[in-house]
Amino acid sequence: MSILHNDWADVLEAEFQKPYYVQLREFLKQEYSTQTIYPSMYDIFNALHYTPLAEAKVVILGQDPYHGPNQAHGLSFSVKPGVPLPPSLQNIFKELREDLGCPIPNNGHLTPWAEQGVLLLNTVLTVRKGQAASHRGKGWESFTDRVITCLNEREKPVIFVLWGRHAQEKQALITNDRHYILTAPHPSPFSANRGFFGSRPFSTINRILQEQGESQIHWEIPNL
């Protein structure tokens, strides 16, 4: 049975047979059966499900999923409807308001971005409840590095958005100069004032897309 159901399957199915992934899968089986793990196992690959490879225009790279109840659903920075906005997402929405005048919505459900070609990818796709970074170094990084490499190999330009040191370490994988890389400090309250605020990523992305003759992203998240 195919895990992925769009063009990502063509380039990533081989990963699922590799020794590192077989080991990761066994680890996850054990974790999901003995611990509370986020997101739901049915949501792990949502970033890839919502944003096919051929349709990805922008990549916003996150670290690992939110580790509180009902938050994570497989898209970086996004939370399920009805869940309070985490501080980093509050700051993303503040910058969006300053940049493009978009009102801050009553939810942090970023699916509308993903459906327009914004790949909301975490570098680690699972986490234990209440334990940030608990699934780092278990194999996910090899898998998501392959995702980034597939995008790097693509003819059509991609805009990579790398917020914070962790995301910027992945710059080494982006070797093709047809792509665009936007960097800024992480939107976390600990670093947002060091240059995330005022970086205007959303208007910059839309300007690049316009120059390429691509449709721009409608960034405003509707209230629910």
UniProtKB/Swiss-Prot annotation:
> What EC class is this?
hydrolase
CDD domains reported in the protein's UniProt record:
UDG-F1-like
Q: Name one GO molecular function term.
A: uracil DNA N-glycosylase activity
Active site per the UniProt annotation: D64
Query: Would you tell me the Gene Ontology cellular component terms?
Result: cytoplasm
Q: Name one GO biological process term.
A: base-excision repair, AP site formation via deaminated base removal
Compartments, as annotated in UniProt: Cytoplasm
Which spans of this chain does the record mark as coiled coil?
Answer: none
Alphabetical keyword list = Cytoplasm, DNA damage, DNA repair, Hydrolase
Q: Does the keyword DNA repair apply?
A: yes
User: What is an example of a Pfam family matching this protein?
Assistant: UDG
EC number of the protein: 3.2.2.27
Q: Which reaction does it catalyse?
A: Hydrolyzes single-stranded DNA or mismatched double-stranded DNA and polynucleotides, releasing free uracil
Q: Cross-referenced InterPro entries, in alphabetical order? A: UDG_fam1, Ura-DNA_Glyclase_AS, Uracil-DNA_glycosylase-like, Uracil-DNA_glycosylase-like_sf
> Its family?
Belongs to the uracil-DNA glycosylase (UDG) superfamily. UNG family.
Q: What function does this protein fulfil?
A: Excises uracil residues from the DNA which can arise as a result of misincorporation of dUMP residues by DNA polymerase or due to deamination of cytosine.
Name of the molecule in the record = Uracil-DNA glycosylase
Gene for this chain: ung
